[in-house]
Amino acid sequence: MLKEHSKKQHLRREVQEKLKNEAIVAAQTLSTAVVDHLNAKVAQAYGNQKRLDVEAKRFENNSAALAKQTEQWLFITEGLNYALKEIGDVENWSKTIENDMKIITETLRRAYEAKNPPLPPNQANPASH
């Protein structure tokens, strides 16, 4: 009976040791699976962050290019405004000159008429008599 009891205890210990080893293997398998899953998520997050960094850099470059283009447009617009102002100034100057020439022409015509009065109608053409 003692031998039988010792044998049963020994078998029970072997079964418990086997179950313990299986539990350890299962725990290691589970922890490996969890770590692999987490590593996959971390790798995905890292990849997403890299893509975001690339997009942010591209956005920054595009923004700088847009700012430069806008400055060029402003410079061109200012030049156009200045040219249009000069054209307006030339137009006003030419109208002033034209008006002055009309005044001079009218003054000369009146001076000529004052110095050379028109002939009476019957003396205008002596050959018609």
UniProtKB/Swiss-Prot annotation:
Principal cellular location given in the protein's record: mitochondrion
Cytoplasm listed as a keyword: yes
Entry's Gene Ontology BP terms: endosomal transport; positive regulation of gut granule assembly
Superkingdom of origin organism: Eukaryota
One GO cellular component term noted in the UniProt record for this chain: BLOC-1 complex
Keywords: Cytoplasm, Mitochondrion
Signal peptide residues on this chain, from the entry's feature table: none
Subcellular compartments: Mitochondrion intermembrane space; Mitochondrion matrix; Cytoplasm, Cytosol
Family: Belongs to the BLOC1S1 family.
Entries under PANTHER family matching the protein: BIOGENESIS OF LYSOSOME-RELATED ORGANELLES COMPLEX 1 SUBUNIT 1, BLOC-1 COMPLEX SUBUNIT 1
Function as written in the Swiss-Prot or TrEMBL entry: Component of the biogenesis of lysosome-related organelles complex-1 (BLOC-1), a complex involved in gut granule biogenesis. May negatively regulate aerobic respiration through mitochondrial protein lysine-acetylation.
Assembly mode: Component of the biogenesis of lysosome-related organelles complex-1 (BLOC-1) composed at least of blos-1, blos-2, blos-4, dsbn-1, glo-2, mutd-1 and snpn-1. Interacts with glo-2.
The name this protein goes by in its record: Biogenesis of lysosome-related organelles complex 1 subunit 1
Organism in which the protein naturally occurs: Caenorhabditis elegans
